[in-house]
């Protein structure tokens, strides 16, 4: 859950998001070390009068500044590629949820069950109950089980949308005529908020996403009440 004046990421609630946070810290440390080294060299150049005016060739230096950046790029690329493959991997999902974007609401269909589908609209500010969040609450939440692999099938009925839930590390474009796929697995119960992350028209800001992640037993009880 985000909070005002937040500078960092939201707390990770899925294995994918945890990996993304580790990769962010890994890359940020490399960037910090490189920036510190460059600033140190610049400060030396500005504060000293020593210089080599007759240097015409320095093969050792050229070799170092060719090999070192290549090694750094490899250190960044390898974990990045690993996470990309993890995000695309779909292994025998326990549940499939089809998501369709509209101007300006979402519709959901639990494809493993017959006639279990609904639309999800933002709750107007005038109808909010105490404790509910402005521009983030919906009339019908998605209810999903925790610790199970869930396949998301995402598309759009009209224009480009993007289905994004930061805490779960999910952001997939909803494109008309194309069915995109994503994996979702929550590591703990909770209510997670997201929004459409692709400018899609006048009411783009009013397309919230709310996921209620519950233990499997509670999910089965919810299913019985909906079917």
UniProtKB/Swiss-Prot annotation:
Cofactor note: Binds a dinuclear copper A center per subunit.
Entry keyword annotation includes Kinase: no
Positions of Cu cation A2 binding: 196, 198, 200, 204
Membrane topology term: Multi-pass membrane protein
Source organism of the structure: Hapalemur griseus (Gray gentle lemur)
Name of the molecule in the record: Cytochrome c oxidase subunit 2
GO CC entries: mitochondrial inner membrane; respiratory chain complex IV
Subunit structure: Component of the cytochrome c oxidase (complex IV, CIV), a multisubunit enzyme composed of 14 subunits. The complex is composed of a catalytic core of 3 subunits MT-CO1, MT-CO2 and MT-CO3, encoded in the mitochondrial DNA, and 11 supernumerary subunits COX4I, COX5A, COX5B, COX6A, COX6B, COX6C, COX7A, COX7B, COX7C, COX8 and NDUFA4, which are encoded in the nuclear genome.
Binding site for Mg(2+): 198
Keyword Metal-binding: yes
InterPro entries noted in UniProt: CcO_II, CcO_II-like_C, CcO_II_C, Copper_CuA, Cupredoxin, Cyt_c_oxidase_su2, Cyt_c_oxidase_su2_TM_dom, Cyt_c_oxidase_su2_TM_sf
Gene3D superfamilies: 1.10.287.90, Cupredoxins - blue copper proteins
Top EC class for this record: translocase
Pfam families referenced in this protein's UniProt entry, alphabetically: COX2, COX2_TM
């Amino acid at each position: 859950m985000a909070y005002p004046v937040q500078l960092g990421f939201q707390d990770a609630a899925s294995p994918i998001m945890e990996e993304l946070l580790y990769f962010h810290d890994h890359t940020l440390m490399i960037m910090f070390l490189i920036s510190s080294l460059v600033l140190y060299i610049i400060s030396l150049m500005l504060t000293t009068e020593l210089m080599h005016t007759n240097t015409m060739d320095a093969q050792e230096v050229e070799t170092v500044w060719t090999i070192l950046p290549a090694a750094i790029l490899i250190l960044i690329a390898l974990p990045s590629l690993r996470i990309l493959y993890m995000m695309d991997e779909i292994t025998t999902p326990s549940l499939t949820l089809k998501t369709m974007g509209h101007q300006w609401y979402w519709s959901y269909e639990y494809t493993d069950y017959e006639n279990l589908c609904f639309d999800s609209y933002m709750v107007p500010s005038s109808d909010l109950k105490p404790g509910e969040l402005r521009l983030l609450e919906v009339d019908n939440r998605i209810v999903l089980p925790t610790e199970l692999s869930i396949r998301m099938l995402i598309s759009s009925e009209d224009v480009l949308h993007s289905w994004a839930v930061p805490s779960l590390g999910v952001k997939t474009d909803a494109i008309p005529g194309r069915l995109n796929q994503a994996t979702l697995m929550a590591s703990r119960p909770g209510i997670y908020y997201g929004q459409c992350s692709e400018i899609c028209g006048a009411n783009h800001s009013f397309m919230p996403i709310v996921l209620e992640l519950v233990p499997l037993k509670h999910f089965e009880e919810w299913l019985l009440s909906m079917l």
